[in-house]
């Protein structure tokens, strides 16, 4: 546990000492602020549903930037060998990088909570969909970071890692549109692999155990494969 905490502090320092983290936060809040203002004062929308779907898309684009360097950079600089020859094992390394990345994303979501406060000031929002929407975003982010870690563990090139994860995210985003064209039972199998299909219930105030299980399973499988890839290479 102590070794994990040491690794976590190291990852947090590396992440938040980089200007990339603050640029991502600034761009994220700028886009969300603009969209929220339009929805509130022009469309008079008193929900965050539209905002949740925009955050969904932004995560598809920003998580590859966050995760691309996690292991790929360690391989390029050959510092991964130093970590592996220390008392830290592959599982501790992967989970430290995962938690550090999630801390940045959770911080972004906490800051976006200001929009919910504004809704409460100007009206009487339904808090159920707001809480379920944020829960869905956390679960989505965990799955995306897991996949991003996996792609980063497969290469020493950050750009390749980012492109691999971005391609995977975009495929899992639109796969349901093509799944409906397949014959039974392949159609339901492919559709159920879609990130958006499992996110929509959260954004609209519904919570199903199957959707929670999907994101948790995707996260744990990605982390497991990341550990194995790190051990194998």
Which positions does each model-derived feature cover?
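Terminal transmembrane helical anchor/hairpin motif
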Residues: 164, 168-229
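Long, hydrophobic alpha-helical segments
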Residues: 53-73, 108
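Transmembrane helix boundary and interhelical loop/hinge segments in multi-pass membrane proteins
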Residues: 47-48, 66-84, 98
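Hydrophobic alpha-helical transmembrane segments of multi-pass membrane transport/permease proteins
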Residues: 19-38, 54-63, 167-171
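Secretory targeting signals
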Residues: 35-37, 48, 58, 100-159, ...
């Amino acid at each position: 546990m102590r070794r994990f905490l040491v690794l976590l502090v190291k990852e947090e320092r590396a992440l938040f000492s980089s200007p990339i983290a603050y640029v991502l936060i600034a761009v994220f809040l700028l886009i969300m602020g603009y969209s929220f203002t339009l929805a509130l004062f022009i469309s008079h929308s008193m929900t965050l549903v539209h905002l949740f779907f925009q955050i969904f898309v932004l995560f598809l684009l920003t998580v590859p930037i966050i995760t691309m360097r996690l292991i790929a950079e360690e391989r390029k600089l050959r510092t991964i060998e130093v970590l592996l020859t220390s008392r830290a094992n592959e599982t501790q390394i992967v989970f430290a990088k995962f938690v550090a990345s999630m801390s940045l994303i959770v911080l972004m979501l906490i800051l976006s909570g200001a929009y919910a406060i504004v809704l409460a000031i100007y009206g009487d929002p339904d808090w159920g969909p707001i809480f379920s929407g944020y829960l869905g975003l956390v679960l989505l982010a965990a799955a995306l970071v897991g996949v991003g870690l996996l792609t980063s563990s497969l290469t020493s090139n950050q750009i390749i890692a980012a492109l691999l994860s971005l391609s995977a995210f975009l495929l899992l985003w639109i796969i349901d549109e093509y799944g409906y064209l397949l014959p039974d039972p392949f159609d339901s199998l492919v559709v159920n692999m879609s990130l958006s299909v499992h996110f929509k219930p959260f954004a609209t105030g519904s919570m199903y155990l199957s959707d929670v299980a999907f994101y948790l399973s995707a996260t744990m499988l990605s982390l497991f494969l990341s550990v194995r890839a790190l051990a194998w290479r």
